[in-house]
Amino acid sequence: MEFDRHGLYKPHGPANWYKKPSESFSQTCPFSPAAKNEDELSLANFPVTRQQTDLLGRFQSNYVGHVVEQEYRNQGSSGGMVTWVAAELMRKGLIDGVLHVIAIADPQSDGRFFKYRIARNQQELNEGAKSRYYPVELSEVLQLIAEVPGRYAVVALPCMTKAIHLLRQQDPVFKERIPFTLGLFCGHMKSAGFVQSFAWQLNVPLKAVKEVEYRYKNPDRPANWYNAMLKLENGEIQNRDWWHLVDGDWGAGFFMSSACNYCDDVVSETADVAFGDAWVEPYSSDGRGTNVVIARSELVDTMIREAIAESRLQLEEVDGAFVEQTQAAGFRQRREGLAYRLTWAKKGIRPVKRVVADANRATKERKLIYRTRFWISKWSHRMLWLGRKMNMPGIYTSWARAALSFYHGIAYHKGNFSEMKKRYVEFKK
């Protein structure tokens, strides 16, 4: 797996490999029409569950809250639950290691800012806390698992979690060695170009960047006030609120992978447990961070309930409707929006989704939003590439300023031109 010119991973191999059909590959790729879908995998993984909804899939219980013990909450972007569950599985002797994403110590020599690594103790687990909106791939760590016997948990996005379960069905070694998956809620995957955009807008050369933090945490500010921070090789720190970035609205879809347009899983439906942010009040205003948790496996649910009883976790049980509300925008994009996108003419392989193609489900206003989001995601890659090639950052930032101003006008102000102009002027300040 290597980066393409847009900072997204693509498989690379001999020319004859591309031309030779592979049944096992077709059944393992999470976006392949030949692969099992999330409903089929979830039923196989969790044949008996207490609850099920169309949007959340199968589950035992849902919770909202945070970790009380130690520094889990402070170290993470949200409530600390992802690292806590991984650590608890390790503490109980149920796993020997955790596949998670960490920052690379020397990104300039490596060519990446983040990668998957196997954590085998608490200190290494803590290094994987926080959100990383950066493309990663699993081939390196999966090779290690194949070579080194043990029991492992994987922390992954919905599509990668699905891929792990498809791989487990194909290969008995991975079925034995990966007994747990810890899924993350997902809006979409960003390309590596997002970091380049940060650097341009903060007026620092990308080659001088040592660390990237997408959500710099400040307990005195609302959790949904994202702040991007870059730490430079000389120790200098530059940061800016996402609201003041020309591509800082997540919903606009800047640098989104094209595959994300055809994904219908927001909440990691195939994972043993899944985690997201509680994007509803009063939780979204709590800068300390709050998790929403979906426990699908009975074992993990029991583990969580025991920790609540021991006052190690401050979690409140909630119903499915509450969880769905916290991710309402993501579900619109992956249900109503996907139904509309599936009606568009498309060359090549046609994705097979659980959502039925429907051009009448969305209103005209929503259709314009979905169209705009699609084209912003498509052209953001191209305009950033052109800006780099010409060594003219303004090619990208000027285009992005106009694109986001238009998006804000149609998404939040019913197409009001004066509001578009107002937002455009704000970005220029």
Stretches found by the model and what they are:
Residues 76, 81-90, 94-146:
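Portal/gating segments that form or line small-molecule/metal binding sites
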